[in-house]
Swiss-Prot record:
It is a multi-pass membrane protein. Keywords: Cell membrane, Membrane, Transmembrane, Transmembrane helix, Transport. The chain crosses the membrane at residues 41-61, 98-118, 134-154, 169-189, 229-249, 282-302. It is found in: Cell membrane. The keyword Transport applies. This is Probable ABC transporter permease protein MG189 homolog. It comes from Mycoplasma pneumoniae (strain ATCC 29342 / M129 / Subtype 1). InterPro entries: MetI-like (IPR000515), MetI-like_sf (IPR035906). Pfam families: BPD_transp_1. Its main location: membrane. PANTHER family: ABC TRANSPORTER PERMEASE PROTEIN MG189-RELATED (PTHR43744:SF12), ABC TRANSPORTER PERMEASE PROTEIN MG189-RELATED-RELATED (PTHR43744). Probably part of a binding-protein-dependent transport system. Probably responsible for the translocation of the substrate across the membrane. One of its GO terms (biological process) is transmembrane transport.
Amino acid sequence: MFKQSLIWYNRYVQKRKKGLDLTIKDRSWSNVLLGLIFKTVVLCFFGLMVIFPFYLMLVVALTSDEVVLNIREPILKSDGWHFENFRRVLEDGKYLNAIWINSLVTILSIILRLFFTVSMGYAFSLKKWKLKKLFWFIFLAVLILPESALLIGQYRVVVVANWNQPEKPAIILGLTMPFVASVFSGFMFRTAFEAIPPRIKESAFVDGCTGLRYFLKIAFPMVRSTTWTVSILTAFAAWNSYLWPLLLLTNRPDLNINLWVLAQGTDGNAGQSDEQIRVLLNLKMAAAILAILPMFIVYFLFRKRIMKAVGSRANTIKG
């Protein structure tokens, strides 16, 4: 019996050795070089797909009016460095006010969404409470509805609350309405809170920690990566929103950066027909660059902190 087992073991060792030899042969210098070339080509291809739209935007923004109006093909090279296009879109004096209102709406949307979704996620992460399954089913059912289907109800709430008057400060609350709550963000926080080992909560309560203190001092810091993810998604949604501000601010492009971009580059009066109004694409591209500039600045200032927070994992071992 022992001899037969030894024979089977030797055969197993020989098979493993052959497999190892094949692996070593497969990792020859030619295969490694081909793999490196393939990865480089793929990375360059997708890198160009990301960079090319920004390059095209910058080229068009620096092109003169004559070339933009007469060209019949895509502009891949500018006819000069017409930086005066940026000065022309800033002449109306509405850019800074639109940036300020947009920033205020974005910050307020992040704060309110974190407040509601963190509370929702933590509540549904608790083990048992009455009607938990019923409320969770109702919240998940909301995910079936598209965002456009909710606009009518949201607009009705804003009108009843009198938050749709652009000349009043309450318009800020009206602009933040669609971004205050999110079932998807609440689902993310629920999953993050449920991933915390139960022994941490048990140890905290043994040490005399109350429920609120445990939530603020232990549970919430441990879902920091989810907090940053929700904040980033909310910031992009609030900053790039167009349809909702268009409903509330039809004639006030100075209160939203995207409406300000839409209003730029039209050479004509309101009384003229569509054929008489010229659209200067270079001015629109210049305005678009100025619109995304604040987000780029914020990202480059906090990129290390954002990447560190998103990539971090909470320590689940009590020290």
